[in-house]
Amino acid sequence: MHKTAIYPGTFDPLTNGHMDIIRRASMIFDTLIVAVAKSATKEPMFPLSEREEMLRLATRECPSVRVESFDTLLADFAQERGACILVRGLRAVSDFEYELQMGYANASLNPALETIYLMPSLQNAFISSSVIRSILLHKGKISHLVPPVVCEYIQKRRSCM
């Protein structure tokens, strides 16, 4: 049976932690849709089109990965794509409470939808997009925190490093 999973997020920007989860989830599922959220509640540093492009560049050698954007309820997006599994990353206990609530909310909207949680590898456990945005705002180095193609993309587009 073909299993399609969705890994949703704002990916503002894509981190090594995100890529860790993407690589591992893509080995578990037949198709992994990395779903870039057009967030109504967050003001992103990078526009949706740039976040999608960074993901496409970083996942171009992952044949089972598709990058798509969405601005609907995640449960509806999953149903439209025939996905029955959501993949979420957990870095710390503080992530768990939020993710548990979101998992229950999505299951209440789509009872066929399961959420699985993957922990990033230890070297990526501290990385978050918000930390990277803060470093970028202060013109710091991010090359050890993001995939090389993302670092190059940001350097070319933002000239802020």
From Swiss-Prot:
Q: Which InterPro entries is this protein grouped with?
A: Cyt_trans-like, PPAT, Rossmann-like_a/b/a_fold
Give residues annotated as binding substrate.
Answer: 10, 42, 74, 88
Cofactors needed by this protein, per the record, are:
Mg(2+)
Q: In this chain's numbering, which residues are marked as the site (Transition state stabilizer)?
A: 18
Q: Which keywords appear in this protein's UniProt record, sorted alphabetically?
A: ATP-binding, Coenzyme A biosynthesis, Cytoplasm, Magnesium, Nucleotide-binding, Nucleotidyltransferase, Transferase
What Pfam families does the annotation carry?
CTP_transf_like
- Pathway the protein takes part in: Cofactor biosynthesis; coenzyme A biosynthesis; CoA from (R)-pantothenate: step 4/5
EC number per UniProt: 2.7.7.3
Residues annotated for ATP binding in this entry: 10-11, 18, 89-91, 99, 124-130
Question: Which GO BP terms sit in this record?
Answer: coenzyme A biosynthetic process
Give me the reactions it catalyses. (R)-4'-phosphopantetheine + ATP + H(+) = 3'-dephospho-CoA + diphosphate
Spell out where the chain crosses the membrane.
Answer: none
> Where does it primarily localize?
cytoplasm
Where does it localize?
Answer: Cytoplasm
Listed GO CC annotations: cytoplasm
Which GO terms fall under molecular function for this chain's record?
A: ATP binding; pantetheine-phosphate adenylyltransferase activity
Cited SUPFAM superfamilies: Nucleotidylyl transferase
**Protein purpose:** Reversibly transfers an adenylyl group from ATP to 4'-phosphopantetheine, yielding dephospho-CoA (dPCoA) and pyrophosphate.
Q: Which family does it belong to?
A: Belongs to the bacterial CoaD family.
| NCBIfam families (UniProt xref) | coaD_prev_kdtB (TIGR01510), cyt_tran_rel (TIGR00125)
Q: How does it assemble?
A: Homohexamer.
Q: What is this protein called?
A: Phosphopantetheine adenylyltransferase
Q: Which organism is this protein's natural source?
A: Wolinella succinogenes (strain ATCC 29543 / DSM 1740 / CCUG 13145 / JCM 31913 / LMG 7466 / NCTC 11488 / FDC 602W)
